[in-house]
Amino acid sequence: ESRRDYWYEQFVWALQRGAIPAGRIISNAGAGAHKPATSTINCTVSGTVEDSMHQILDKVHEAGLTLKAGCGIGYEFSTLRPRGAYVSGAGAYTSGPLSFMDIYDKMCFTVSSAGGRRGAQMGTFDVGHPDAMEFIRSKREAGRLRQFNLSLLITDDFMQAVKEDRPWALAFPVTQKEVDEDGIDLDDEEQVVWREWSVQDQYVRNDSGLIACRTYKTIPARRMWDVIMSSTYDFAEPGFVLIDRVNELNNNWWCENIRATNPCGEQPLPAYGACLLGSVNLTKFVITPFTDKAHFDWEEYREVVRVFTRMLDNVVEINGLPLTAQREEILRKRRHGMGFLGLGSTLTLLGIRYGSPESVKFTEDVARELALSGWEMGLELAREKGPAPILAESFKVTEDMLLKRPAMEVDGWRVGDSIPGRILHARYSHYMNKVAEVAPDLVEKLAKEGARFTHHSSIAPTGTISLSLANNASNGIEPSFAHHYFRNVIRE
């Protein structure tokens, strides 16, 4: 009880000194008597929407429950076969993934109109899907997909094709039945390309784990690039997710294949992953602003981050997520995303021009200290309460692991060996390798003992909390867009 009182005082101190939990925590934590079916989690990612009517409608149902709880949700829709493809069970041709996105769009509008918060959705789509061009242009149609943010999953292969001005194949996976019935030659490069795909069970797969994809159309990669750029310029969509880079830098690289993000895009997540957020208001740490003696209080900043890290970890226990799979996912990995807001305003208070070399160094310092302080607390919490369950588990070394991380083989790991999750996380994550460049002893301790969580940092746009709780400081890492503006409120 005495420790509870101590940390209560510490949490209040951190909140007064710039720690701002995300909107769902502020809105729903402690409000169980008035709205028991709500969550403290801002956003989630759906389970994989597989290519069947049952799966599509099942995920609509899950999304409805998630939105009802106050969470936003992201999905990948390029798992669905393209428009005009034959559906053998129905004896008809499919209308394609965009038409099914319309169902999710209407569902989101209907559910959110019943509550006090507008629903938020992210739809992601692979750049190699046959309907990718339709996806890119979808918001040119008035009123369509207005409950969605849209992002393209951009692969390294596509970027290389753009650089080399090569043709780009728009293709979709084939089953063995389709290969046999349609006489597809798997060795014909004009008919088939082999690609990584998020769903593998039902499709033809080679020894390298790549999926056979039937080419529907080939277009110049630079033409597609121009369409993406013009749409982004005209409508600010679709977003641009370098998905291979995301998976390469994912701390849980050995057990997750990320294909979607939360609605604002700051946190790529696996199936049923949750986005537990909080931000630190940097303007609170500027001493004697607008003077020659203006400086940043680094010691207090580090301590606020440490206390806030413990607070966000506690929120995992009261997540209030509606689906069993969501609750299991967050409890197993305990990921959260702490970021900062007010960077632009803080630079102004310090007399630093936004975009100058000095501002870049300050931003690097802020992000580095946020990460280091967070992982230090992650180690301390693991010692006190235990590491995230996944980091206490053991995993079998696979050929895929050794292919992704050649350093494992150099260190003596072989296929079939048993390796603790904490070592895969701390020693072989590319992100944790960057942390180790600054704090090698800390990362080595994390490899030996494990961390309380698998992920710590995530910088959100913070549009609402910057205005309502940070005295209209600039949001996220951006400069101030305007010093006064109007904002609509759904209801009073």
Predicted feature residues:
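Extended catalytic cores of very large enzyme megasubunits
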Residues: 1-492
